[in-house]
């Protein structure tokens, strides 16, 4: 398939799988039978049935779940990369598919975060979906990890004091990793 055809497959997937109007049929239409599906906020999945069960649980917990693209898709060969943002309000079922803790039913907590996903498309089917997301933000918003680390302000970084004292904090160029 061409790069443009691969981008069209991913565009449809983003809209129908991750969008506000979830279409469960898109899983059988566009996901390979043994799709590899990985995000930092959830256990790795393999196969259409596992992805379908995940989507059902995730959307039962967050009925207004909606993610959308924030930049044009980038493609090379079989790979398509998309940037996105989105989230939802936890007004539904209990949800325990998180790396830390779980949510009882209907907490009313809102999560909104961003990420980048790399998808592999082979013969018109998505064989891999690997997401790199800002899971820490979502976990904080859901109350599963503290909003601050050891009393630091929310926008702070553990290394911020070091950075302010170092030459890097004064506009010096970053060190090169070249040998």
Residue ranges and their predicted role:
Residues 1-179:
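C-terminal and inter-domain tail/linker signature
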